[in-house]
Amino acid sequence: MRVGGAFHLLLVCLSPALLSAVRINGDGQEVLYLAEGDNVRLGCPYVLDPEDYGPNGLDIEWMQVNSDPAHHRENVFLSYQDKRINHGSLPHLQQRVRFAASDPSQYDASINLMNLQVSDTATYECRVKKTTMATRKVIVTVQARPAVPMCWTEGHMTYGNDVVLKCYASGGSQPLSYKWAKISGHHYPYRAGSYTSQHSYHSELSYQESFHSSINQGLNNGDLVLKDISRADDGLYQCTVANNVGYSVCVVEVKVSDSRRIGVIIGIVLGSLLALGCLAVGIWGLVCCCCGGSGAGGARGAFGYGNGGGVGGGACGDLASEIREDAVAPGCKASGRGSRVTHLLGYPTQNVSRSLRRKYAPPPCGGPEDVALAPCTAAAACEAGPSPVYVKVKSAEPADCAEGPVQCKNGLLV
């Protein structure tokens, strides 16, 4: 009993000394993820017990602790001693760090760190010394925000095809997470659930696969594959690239064209063009057939031996190519009595007379019997229709030979 009572008395006597200490308010360790270029306040508020007020001075130190155990060292970059503020041995921090309070001895040893750089990533420790010492650590991780990503699509946006939505950020501290969201257009339960998932990209992928197989991850983290697309997939899709300190977005549009409808339209157009082509060919064939018969006859008539009414044929047809004895005269459709021999025979008068002169020139004097040219008038020939025309050659008398060439009348020998 005496031993226990003595030990209890000792604890009572020593308790004021054990309780008198510097205490820093807040958690013992804090972890911060900060963006490059930001400003941050590293807190270190402290309190002193009444027993701590004494002749001993107050010392405050801020140091950067290397987390690598092999190179563990402490670099004091800011301190307060003997009521003076001192900058330490880190030049890259001297212009960017200061105490938050003008007088750190007033129970606040917090500091402001400005324009953070990725190289500022480290563990920062605050130490407050009086009769005793208290410490507090803050782990600072400085990262670059994701760069503005690029969004684009690969694949033909036609009904039933597969389309890949691509998203890529060229800058930003790793790890980067990619998420897609449909921000306009048709929304369906399985689409909305997968797009609005708050999980990271990889866990979101398994969440999608459990609902619908048409959404898959591509070869890269920022790829989203839409399989067997339809008009229900039309809309704007937003890609969000994020890390611990920020995010950036880009938007791409999906507009599916119905290839079946396009095929029907193309078929209708081609069918219409084919029908018009066939109609044009048919009309051209009919025109050629009609013009071919009349043209051939006209061509023959132009030379005086066709059945049609050619230029040279006039109203007469089926004229022989040359005049023979006992040849049948062609039919004549002369309109009046004034028709000339050209309309009877189908030849111009001068040509007939020249032909008769050459072919039926009078025989030499004293030749065979006399031949007379049978008279024929245009009116008689036209009224009677085709009739034989006989050409008789009359032998010239000796007196005629003496007188000269036989006289002609109206292009015929008389």
Swiss-Prot record:
It is a single-pass type I membrane protein. It comes from Homo sapiens. It is found in: Membrane. This is V-set and immunoglobulin domain-containing protein 8. The chain crosses the membrane at residues 264-284. Pfam families: Ig_3, V-set. Its main location: membrane. Residues 285-414 are cytoplasmic. Residues 22-141, 146-257 form the Ig-like V-type domain. GO terms for cellular component: membrane. The gene is VSIG8. PROSITE patterns: IG_LIKE. Gene3D superfamilies: Immunoglobulins. Residues 1-21 form the signal peptide. The keyword Transcription regulation does not apply. InterPro entries: Ig-like_dom, Ig-like_dom_sf, Ig-like_fold, Ig_sub, Ig_sub2, Ig_V-set, V-set/Ig_domain. Residues 22-263 are extracellular. GO terms for molecular function: RNA binding. Keywords: Disulfide bond, Immunoglobulin domain, Membrane, Repeat, Signal, Transmembrane, Transmembrane helix. SUPFAM superfamilies: Immunoglobulin (SSF48726). Disulfide bonds join 44-126, 167-239.
